[in-house]
Structure formats: C-alpha cells, structure tokens
Regions:
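Juxtamembrane segments at transmembrane-helix boundaries
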Residues: 18-38, 46-192, 196-213
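Hydrophobic alpha-helix/TM-entry signal in multi-pass membrane transporters
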Residues: 6-9, 36, 40
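Hydrophobic transmembrane alpha-helical segments in integral membrane proteins
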Residues: 1-19
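Alpha-helical protein-protein interaction elements
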Residues: 3, 32, 154, 220-221
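Heptad-repeat alpha-helical coiled-coil signal-transmission segments
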Residues: 207, 214-217, 221-228
Length: 232
C-alpha cells in the first residue's frame, strides 16, 4: 500500500470514511438510540464530507478541496471527541476544540491564499487533529470503569496511535519543503501513512464504538437485574 499514489489512497480513505459514517448513522437511527452515538455519527459524517472534498482536489475549487475539506476534518474529529466525553459520563462542553477548529480554518486561509505553503498547511491540520485525538484517547483510557476495559483500550489505543503519528507528521513537515504545492503530487512514507492509518482508524472505530455501547448497555441491564433481585 505504500506504493500507491496519494490520489488513490485519498479515494480509499474517502470510501472508508463514508462507510464509517453510514454505519454509525444506521446504528444511531435504527438500533442504539444512545446519546453518545449522535455526535459519533455526526462527526464521522462531517469528516467523511471532508475526505470527499479532498479526493476531489483538482476537480473542485481550492476553497472547497483545501480550506473547507480540512476544516471539516477537524470539526468532525472534534464532534467525535464530544461523543467520547458523553460516553464516559462527562459534560460535552469543551469550548477549546471549537477555538482550535476556528484557528485551524484561519491558518488554512492564510497558508492557502496569502502565503501559499503546503508544508505549513500539513503542520496545521496534523497538529490540530493530533491534539483532539490525543484528548479522545485520554478520555477513554483514563477511566476506572472495568466494563469492556479491553474495548476501551482498543479504541483509545487507536486514537492514541493516530494522534502520535499526526504529531510526528506535523514535526516532520516543519523540515520538509515539497517540490509541488499540490498535495496530490506529494510523495513519501509519511504522507502515505497518513491515509493508511486513517483507514485503519476508521475500521477500529467502526468495530469499537458499537462494542463500547453494547458493553455499557449489557452492564446496565446486569446492574438493574441485581437491584431488582435485591428488592424482592
């Protein structure tokens, strides 16, 4: 897969993100009816729209394929973070993620039109996603709840792995000067792995998020049954 060109990987990532969004939306509407599933599904849908625009780069204006697309990615990841907070029983209010999203949009505007710089854009988007995914990992991993601990570590570990990679990508691109300002023309293992690991994260979330809710629901049923037996 490391030999695939960026555009091909972009289309594959678009497909995996769309499948994740569709799956979570279906579960949210038809099965789960759980409070955390709504932001999970919304976040996956918003991020999926971003990957669609990225895959269409060159066919749509830069305002859509660069600025809007990458802002949607950050907004989608931020919305999923709210879902993770709700799942853990925390308040969903986290203003910092929206300040980060707005700052990312402004920096993308600057490095797209005022001072075109592909490396700077990659640093901005990678750092923003790394920060939010790291926060998601901490929310899921920093819990005393024993229920479905292995699943929480699986999902939290996937977030953490991707956050670490995106942080490395941000740092690496501080020292990389691309030959072309067209992202789809870039090469190198780091840029390729960004898509490969995103596909992996999509599959991890598609499997792990429903299992998290299923485990918590089963535990709640067990607890309710035990309380009922105590009463009688």
């Amino acid at each position: 897969m490391l030999d695939l060109d960026i555009r091909t990987l972009g289309w594959l990532t678009m497909m995996s993100s769309i499948l994740l969004a569709l799956g979570l939306q279906i579960i949210n509407r038809a099965i789960a009816r759980n409070a955390c599933f709504r932001p999970w599904a919304q976040g996956a849908t918003v991020a999926g729209a971003g990957f669609v625009l990225i895959a269409l780069r060159g066919s749509v204006p830069d305002a859509l394929s660069i600025m809007t697309a990458n802002t949607l990615l950050v907004a989608g990841v931020a919305t999923q973070y709210l879902g993770n907070r709700i799942f853990q029983g925390k308040t969903p209010e986290s203003p910092w993620i929206w300040w980060l999203t707005a700052t990312t949009a402004l920096l993308l505007l600057y490095f797209t039109y005022l001072t075109p710089n592909l490396s700077a854009r990659i640093v901005v988007i990678s750092a923003a996603i790394a920060a939010i995914d790291f926060a998601s990992a901490i929310v899921l991993l920093n819990s005393n709840e024993q229920t479905k601990r292995s699943v929480r570590w699986f999902v939290g570990g996937a977030y953490l792995l991707y956050a670490i990679f995106m942080a490395i990508r941000a740092i690496a691109n501080l020292f990389i000067t691309p030959i072309d300002q067209n992202f789809m023309a870039t090469t190198g293992a780091i840029q390729t792995l960004a898509f490969v690991l995103q596909i992996g994260l999509d599959f991890a979330l598609a499997l792990g998020l429903p299992l998290l809710v299923l485990g918590k629901t089963n535990q709640q049923l067990i607890d309710s049954e035990q309380r009922y037996r105590t009463l009688i």
